[in-house]
């Protein structure tokens, strides 16, 4: 973290932001320098998050904001409302960090191309949670989201969680999709077997003990009847 000294010298500030990789240096600039386009541009090129300290007018500067979100998608949070509704700006942001979708306008959260780009990002829970309800019910998009985030199925529409065909595809991509599947399909032997097969493959380079433990954890989400299925219990032991 930088110290609390306010920098008023333009050349000193330019040198400081060029060397700073944290995005915090601009915080110590004078108000005049926070409104200096060249200073702010240098700052966001190094770390887009510096946009949060820029003058409000520069947070609405389209070219500058694009530079910022290309470097750090999180910078979209600090962009003006008009730029949060700008398709190109938001696309650049979600290409860098899918979950930047949370800062986009509602209209763009309903834009299929924008959301498809966002869900491609590997993130723990992924960007699907920020998509419109309509797109959470989009089969192709949800399956694409699962490729980037094993937990994405949590945010899928309930109709998809109860759709056998969709769930079979989902558990083949990520066995963990079983966690959020409808109770009816947790009692579907083929669905559970496909989820287990995915785990067997995912843990093929692990020890047999690690693989068995992972499968046992997964089977806790199957129906009670299938948890006691001899074939599935054998897979968990092998």
Residue ranges of model-derived segments:
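Non-catalytic tandem-repeat scaffold regions and their flanking low-complexity/translocation tails
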Residues: 1-238
């Amino acid at each position: 973290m930088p110290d609390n000294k306010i920098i008023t010298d333009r050349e000193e500030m330019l040198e400081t932001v060029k060397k700073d990789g944290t995005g915090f240096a601009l915080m110590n600039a004078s108000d005049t320098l926070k409104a200096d386009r060249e200073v702010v541009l240098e700052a966001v090129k190094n770390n887009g998050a510096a946009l949060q300290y820029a003058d409000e007018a520069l947070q609405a500067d389209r070219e500058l904001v694009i530079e910022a979100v290309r470097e750090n998608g999180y910078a979209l949070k600090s962009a003006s409302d008009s730029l949060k509704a700008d398709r190109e700006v938001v696309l650049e942001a979600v290409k860098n960090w899918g979950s930047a979708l949370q800062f986009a306008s509602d209209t763009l959260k309903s834009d299929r191309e924008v959301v498809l780009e966002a869900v491609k990002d590997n993130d723990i829970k992924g960007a699907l949670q920020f998509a419109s309800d309509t797109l959470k019910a989009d089969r192709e998009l949800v399956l694409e989201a699962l490729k980037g985030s094993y937990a994405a199925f949590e945010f899928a529409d309930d109709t998809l969680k109860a759709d056998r065909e969709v769930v079979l595809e989902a558990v083949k991509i990520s066995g963990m999709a079983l966690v959020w599947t409808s109770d009816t399909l947790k009692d579907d032997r083929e669905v559970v077997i496909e989820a287990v097969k995915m785990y067997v493959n995912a843990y093929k380079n692990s020890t047999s003990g690690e693989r068995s433990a992972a499968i046992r954890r997964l089977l806790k989400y199957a129906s009670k009847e299938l948890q006691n299925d001899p074939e599935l219990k054998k897979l968990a032991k092998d």
